[in-house]
Amino acid sequence: MTTAPITGPGASAETPAQGTTMADSEATTAFRQRIARIDREAEEHAAARQHAKGKRTARERINDLLDDSTFLEIGRYSGSGAGDKARPSGVVTGFGQIDGRQVAVYSQDFSVSGGALGTIEGDKIVRLLDDALRLRIPVIGLIDSGGAKIQEGVGALRQYGRIFNRTCAASGLVPQISVILGPCAGGAVYSPALTDFVIATRQASHMFVTGPDVVRATTGEQISAEDLGGAQIHGSVSGVVHYVADDEEDALGQVRTFLAYLPSSSEVSAPLYAYDDADAQADAEAARSVGEIVPASTRQAYDVVEVVSAVVDHGELVQVQEEFAPNVVVGFACFEGHPVGIVANQPLVDAGTLDVDASEKLARFVRFCDAFGLPVVTFVDVPGYRPGAEQEHAGIIRRGAKVINAYATATVPLVTIVLRKAYGGAYIVMGSKAIGADLNFCWPGAEIAVLGAAGAVGIIHRRDLAKVRDEQGEEAATAEHERLVAEYTDAVINPDKAVAIGEIDAVIAPEDTRSVIVDSLAALRAKNDARPESPKKHDNIPL
């Protein structure tokens, strides 16, 4: 049976001609032309504003970050609709891929009202974060905004609160990376601060709660935006920034580098990279000379980065917060294709001592690795904590306790290598067996004790040495001190005692370091350290 065409009063006067499809209908054609014009005008406007400052547009940044032709934009015309009054908002949101892995990304558009955040922009970011939580995919935020839309008042501030809420919900569940590519001021700074990693360009980015004008008006202090909250300040002084990039290309490239070591969520494993016999042979050969890097004297410095590079896959170590608290080193590397977190004391800077900044840096990194299932390999060469009133008044007790909490609560595989020395409380907190590490090793001659031999002898034999000095002179006292140091070293601080009580699992030759770490990680790969159910809601970390 056939149905006759509708005629009469109910029929539309605009009925398309017979044979017309949705692909070439008048509505579709008009839509294509309208959207093409709006998008072209918006991008031309954005390019004119951003390129003049040496900056990319919001969409150019997304295209540079993601794999080619993978970006799916969501909510492009939220707030305006796609009709004749269509216009872009101050943020671009959507999904794409990085090295074939799905991610969520938002990019603030400074060419639209200075990238200011209002109801529309906040709704788009919140929706993206909610989607990322459901999909269990990483979130990357490209920040370039003048702040909240003042004309929206508390409505704009509310959106910041909603974003903070979702960011906290995602913390430890999916990796979150913020890239500061322009201004980020006021309450907006807390959004990136809540994420796992903050990357900032050296020249264009600024972060501060109160800007130079407010500082000048309230305190009289004259300070530039760069000196107050530039990337270099946050990368080396405050520790807010984890990587200071030379330019936008470097910043976006670092996002891809970080993600290469991370799982898409805490529920899946990190990527596993191909690793063949040729790779193994080359890395084993490089690792044989690691002992030649480290001087036998505990008083001589060396670069621990060279030590780590000698034993990890392909010599590749990606440092995090390289310029902040340089007396310790943290970063990512691989062993036989498996990503791990690396922690190490740096004897080149303050002899590798621990201080307030180093403690913050170590604790946060270890907790991040634990949240996302990355084993932690710790290289120890530490004389203790940095002494002085400055450190005590800055809270070394409270902040140092964070490192203890991070290691003690970690459930991922923990492998520790003591290279030369580990003294006092610093030994305990740096991934010791007593604090919860799984496997601990040391090199021959490593000194593990409450104090170094010289300091211990000076305390234990203070009266005896004073008597020798009074009766026989300074030269005799010096000789006696050296004899007692050698005696104390042989009796107390050699590795044998640590091995005997189980604090050290084995003394290993330096050239065996890589193979021991590889074997240890393989043995611990199936580690299931789920803690028993507890009536407590969560621990009270000494924040």
What are these regions (language model features)?
Residues 2-543:
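Ligand-binding clefts of soluble mixed alpha/beta catalytic domains
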